[in-house]
Amino acid sequence: MEEYFSIIQFLIEAVKAGASDEHLMVGHPPYMRKNGFIEKTEHPVISKGELDGAILEIAPTAIRDEILTLCDVDFMYEIKGCSRFRINYNRQLGLPALVIRNIPYEIPKLKDLSLPDILSSIVKQPNGIVLVTGPTGSGKSTTIASLVNEINETEAKHIVTIEDPIEYVFDSAKSIVSQRQVEVDTKTFADGIKYSLRQDPDVIFIGEIRDKETMSAALKAAETGHLVLSTLHTNDAVQTINRVVNMFDEANRAIVRKQLAETLRATIAQKLVYSEKLNKRFPACEVMVVTSTIKDYLTKDNTEAIYDILRDSNIDDMITMNASLAKLVESELITQEEALQHSNDTSELEKIFRGVYQGT
């Protein structure tokens, strides 16, 4: 008789251990990611039968009978009183595997995330687009959920979210929050945005902008007077602008640049950096607030010059990623070596360090 692997008990254990992600593969013990690092657990190796059973135990009813024949599926699972989990079912070398992201019930307050104070002002904008960007695992989902909840708790608005899948669940507070899941409540992100415009929204949160159809719908929503929040997998403001523009055919890019110049309010690029001193991670953030000069550069396709404004500006609460990393080093939260690992321009950061530590 095959030994039973309790995925429920394992996930409860992982949450208690402070893990952010879990990896389950046939022929390997379970792994957890803690503070950004993968750790092998002391659990025994998982057999195919055990993992098949675990998958069937947590799979949604609608796909339970067929999930083991599929290749890639994303779904949510909840352990009451513990946490929600975003589950990615996939196959590796012909065998099933799970990658799991823990989604806590409680949405952190902005003030508790060690993020720049300007973020709470950015989401007070009545309209336009705000983009939170960064690589996978950089804390984008947590940051943008905190931004949405800041609006929810402080303003009388109607917030519509369009997600795939729904991660954080918002309890309507001062605002009303309507959450819609792609392929469950709406066909696509673009359709969700299009039809949300008929649902009396003030704020539209798009889980991720993946294609030009979604981006076009987001631009239209912003142009028609709504505040649009979303995420992209880009590392800085310049890369974000270029990614958006390059989603479109060359013939349409000038129009898109003009639309973006009129609607983009801010970009927030972030990374999570490890503090060995405190055994936890802190966000390093680049913040770009769109000014009249940046609008002009956007329209004229001079995006590379935008970084110079960020680097040289001491106003408008803007900051580069390197300046943010240097502040964490100066505060003795992280080492120079850790900062350099996360820098988009290590030579510039080294110059900053020489200035910060001059004479010491």
Predicted regions, residues:
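Short, flexible helix-loop junctions that flank or precede catalytic/ligand sites
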Residues: 1-360
